[in-house]
């Protein structure tokens, strides 16, 4: 009896993984407009220099690399 239950508990997740289920509507990936509002804008970021329109932090900073050019370049 226990071995049958073990086989059932092993086979069911393999046949029907949870990723096969459709996500519900509350997922952030379904709402890109709200996801964009959560990002900090260039004007508010502490490493962004508004006068020179560039990032005054280290060029290796992930935010600077992704959003603005470095002032040192």
From Swiss-Prot:
- State its location(s): Secreted
**What disulfide bonds does the UniProt entry report for this chain?**
54-64, 55-70, 59-71
Which residues are annotated as modified residue Pyrrolidone carboxylic acid in the UniProt record? Answer: 52
Q: One short Pfam family name for this protein? A: Conotoxin
User: Where are residues bearing Cysteine amide located in the sequence?
Assistant: 71
Q: What is known of its domains?
A: The cysteine framework is III (CC-C-C-CC).
What is the protein's name according to its record? Mu-conotoxin SIIIA
Q: Tell me which species this is from.
A: Conus striatus (Striated cone)
């Amino acid at each position: 009896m226990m071995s049958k239950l073990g086989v059932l508990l092993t086979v069911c997740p393999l046949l029907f993984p949870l990723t096969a289920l459709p996500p519900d509507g509350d997922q952030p990936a379904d709402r890109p407009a709200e996801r964009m509002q959560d990002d900090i804008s260039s004007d508010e970021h502490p490493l962004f220099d508004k006068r020179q329109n560039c990032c005054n932090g280290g060029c290796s900073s992930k935010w600077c690399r992704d959003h603005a050019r470095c002032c040192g370049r």
